[in-house]
UniProtKB/Swiss-Prot annotation:
UniProt organism field: Corynebacterium jeikeium (strain K411)
Assembly and oligomerization: Monomer.
Residues annotated to bind L-cysteinyl-5'-AMP: C47, G48, I49, T50, T62, N85, I86, T87, W228, G250, S251, D252, I284
Keywords for the protein's UniProt record, in alphabetical order: ATP-binding, Ligase, Metal-binding, Nucleotide-binding, Zinc
The family this protein is said to belong to: Belongs to the class-I aminoacyl-tRNA synthetase family. MshC subfamily.
GO MF annotations in UniProt: ATP binding; cysteine-glucosaminylinositol ligase activity; cysteine-tRNA ligase activity; zinc ion binding
Enzyme Commission number: 6.3.1.13
Motif ('KMSKS' region): 290-294
Protein name per the record: L-cysteine:1D-myo-inositol 2-amino-2-deoxy-alpha-D-glucopyranoside ligase 1
Chain sites annotated for binding Zn(2+): C47, C232, H257
């Protein structure tokens, strides 16, 4: 599946600073391991959308977070292999299509196209590999078979296959949650703890046997379709290898999704840890209330663009808070971002020496390399007195995706 057009990302002046990010598993900010993988690159996998509804600013903020991370790595001279999935076969998609009286494939295609458009508007660097679940069924089948062969999975009635949480000794390391919290989140976030016959309530579905009216693919263990978590396990490791630098997504994916996608890969491929960093972006609220379709308070990127808002201002509005924090979005915050962008354009029209401009860029690099500290980065630029040969403007484009 194709992604979206690649924005032009300029080469940034100044001294590279190693990128440090907060790792949910280790519960600390630590340097990203940029040791080249088998492809000679730094691997980054970010979980994509389930295309059953329009993507909103809360989704976009997550992808902007990892766009920032990739930009810092690129500015440091690293080659980045960025992969992302699209869960284009899943229950929420079928349920929404049935409710709206449309074909689930058509619904998925329309929402994927809208997501692509939003990412292009925001100048997000696209993944090299943009892979739908339907494209990766053979890969999932192979991983499910590996888990069965390793005794890490078992079959129940209706052709359903589950992975055992005790298949690896380290299960739970990624999210650091206690058992009670795991059970609570598992029930709330798509799990089926009450499924009869499961060895453990937390065991996760990796292959759903065929049900009437649902799409299915043939496999050695019967017709069916992939489970959500193992889909990401297979897509990520088949492109980035059994161990890669960054696994990313929203904070609501830390458990169960990222915990299980890591566990499935580790059990199947016999590795201790799938990703060096598990990085999670906070949630976005509108005027203090979490964005929800049921509340009718979603903010859509394409609507903001159609209303004439500068994409660079939208980025600045998101970057006004730290990526790990649950934070607010409002008309006032967007207006402040637009005013800030106007001030920067006026300030940077002034002239300073090359040494002064380079000093600003070096400080900007250091601030962003420290766990993507965008609030401090914006404060730094607020004090910029001018530019020299667009050294600062180029750095803003390359590091923040903000165009002066």
């Amino acid at each position: 599946m194709h992604a979206w057009p690649d924005p032009s990302v300029p080469v940034v002046a100044g001294t590279p600073v190693p990128l440090k990010l907060f790792d949910t598993a280790d519960q600390r900010v630590k340097e990203v391991d940029t040791t080249p993988d088998a492809n000679g690159e730094v691997g980054m996998y970010v979980c994509g959308i389930t295309p059953y509804d329009s993507t909103h600013l809360g989704h976009a903020a997550t992808y902007l977070t990892f766009d920032l991370a990739q930009r810092q790595l690129l500015a440091n001279g690293h080659k980045v292999h960025y992969a992302q999935n699209i869960t284009d076969v899943d229950d929420p998609l079928f349920e929404r299509a049935e409710r709206d009286g449309v074909d689930w494939r058509e619904l998925g295609t329309s929402q994927i196209n809208l997501f692509r458009s939003d990412m292009e508007i925001l100048s997000v660097i696209p993944p090299r590999d943009y892979i739908g679940a339907m494209e990766s069924v053979d890969e999932v089948i192979a991983m499910v078979q590996q888990l069965l062969d390793a005794g890490a999975a078992y079959e129940l009635d209706q052709g359903d296959i589950y992975a055992s949480i005790d298949a690896t000794e380290q299960f739970g390391y990624e999210s650091n949650l206690d058992r009670a919290t795991m059970e609570e989140y598992f029930a709330e976030r798509g799990g089926d703890p009450d499924r009869e016959g499961k060895r453990d309530p937390l065991d996760a579905l990796i292959w759903r046997g065929h049900r009437e009216g649902e799409p299915a693919w043939d496999s050695p263990f019967g017709p069916g379709r992939p489970g959500w978590h193992v889909e990401c396990s297979a897509i990520a490791t088949n492109r980035l290898g059994s161990h890669f630098a960054i696994q990313g997504g929203g904070s609501d994916l830390a458990f169960p999704h990222h915990e299980f996608s890591a566990a499935h890969a580790e059990a199947a491929l016999k590795v201790e840890r799938m990703a060096g960093h598990y990085v999670h972006a906070g949630m976005i609220a509108l005027d203090g209330v979490k964005m929800s379709k049921s509340l009718g308070n979603l903010v859509f990127v394409h609507k903001l663009s159609e209303a004439g808002h500068d994409p660079s201002a939208i980025r600045l509005a998101v970057f006004a808070g730290h990526y790990r924090e649950d934070r607010d979005f409002s008309d006032a915050i967007l207006a402040e971002a637009e005013e800030r962008l106007t001030r920067w354009r006026e300030q940077l029209a002034g002239e300073v020496s090359e040494a002064e401009a380079t000093e600003v860029v070096d400080k900007l690099r250091a601030i962003l390399a420290d766990d993507l500290n965008t609030p401090e980065a914006l404060s730094l630029l607020d004090g910029a007195a001018g530019d020299c040969n667009q050294i600062i403007a180029t750095a803003l484009d390359g590091l923040l995706g903000v165009r002066i």
